[in-house]
UniProtKB/Swiss-Prot annotation:
Organism from which the protein derives: Synechococcus sp. (strain RCC307)
A GO biological-process term: translation
Protein name: Large ribosomal subunit protein uL29
Top-level lineage group: Bacteria
GO cellular component: cytosolic large ribosomal subunit
Keywords assigned by UniProt, alphabetized: Ribonucleoprotein, Ribosomal protein
Gene from which the chain derives: rpmC
Amino acid sequence: MALPDIAETRKLSDTEINEQISGTRRELFDLRFQQATSRLENPHRFRHARVKLAQLLTVQQERERSAAPAN
């Protein structure tokens, strides 16, 4: 499974980005819980979820900065 592509993330609407952020945070929480209880089958999913979350937050931040008036 390849890492997520930021170009796909940039195509999402603001609402979809917010939904994906909360979903990815929940996924990371679940992965940590599985790791703590020794039920984690795919440890590489940590990296994918972290990269996806970073990309989502980056795009969200870019949009907030472009919408804010420049001083």
